């Protein structure tokens, strides 16, 4: 619909990029629920979420090669970050599809469940997350998003500093209460 309208295409690309950045940087936990199809640009939204639950029979793929185009708009980068190099090359170059179970095996999704159970599973996980301290979840999300690109020493320093910042910012002393309940 935007092929012959560069302004509309730019607007759509900007909106998609803004949305994926919002998902990735949100202080709240985000859950993607995949039921049906996940192709091309949908991988960007999916990768921006913290948890991905898919129907085991959902269909995933990078079909761009079949249409004579590149998986652009950061789709190639996102897909290459999600899966190992061999899988990235295979699926990007063949345009083949794969199911939800394979998406879990490749690290794209967290969990695959029967389609009839998908909504209930996502709601159950959302409720579980709602029982956690929001500030702790936000700090955990930030930490997990950042430490992957750090070496061990840098990660240690970052996490120690992040932990101190959390303790200072947490008016409910979630750590203290959690430790006393654990012990």
What are these regions (language model features)?
Residues 1, 95-100, 120, 124-127, ...:
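C-terminal alpha-helix plus adjacent terminal tail
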Residues 12, 83-84, 149, 175:
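Short linear sequence motifs
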Residues 15-19, 74-78, 87, 139, ...:
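Hydrophobic alpha-helical segments typical of transmembrane helices
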Residues 8-9, 60-61, 80-83, 88-91, ...:
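Short, surface-exposed, polar/charged, turn-prone segments marking secondary-structure boundaries
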Residues 1-19, 38, 66-68, 151:
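Glycine- (often His-adjacent) and acidic-residue-rich active-site loop
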Residues 21-134:
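Crotonase-fold acyl-CoA enzyme core
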């Amino acid at each position: 619909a935007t092929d012959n309208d560069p302004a509309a295409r730019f607007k759509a690309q900007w909106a998609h990029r803004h949305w994926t950045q919002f998902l990735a940087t949100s202080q709240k936990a985000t859950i993607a629920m995949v039921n049906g199809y996940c192709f091309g640009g949908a991988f960007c939204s999916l990768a921006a979420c913290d948890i991905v639950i898919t129907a085991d029979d959902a269909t995933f793929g990078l079909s761009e090669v079949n249409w004579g185009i590149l998986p652009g708009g950061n789709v190639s980068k996102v897909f290459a970050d999600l899966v190992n190099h061999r899988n990235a090359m295979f699926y990007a170059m063949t345009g083949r599809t794969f199911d939800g179970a394979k998406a879990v095996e490749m690290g794209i999704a967290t969990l695959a469940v029967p389609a009839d159970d998908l909504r209930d599973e996502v709601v159950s996980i959302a409720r579980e997350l709602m029982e956690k301290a929001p500030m702790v979840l936000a700090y955990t999300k930030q930490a997990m998003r950042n430490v992957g690109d750090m070496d061990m020493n840098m990660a240690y320093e970052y996490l120690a500093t992040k932990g101190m910042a959390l303790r200072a910012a947490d008016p409910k002393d979630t750590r203290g209460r959690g430790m006393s309940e654990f012990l």
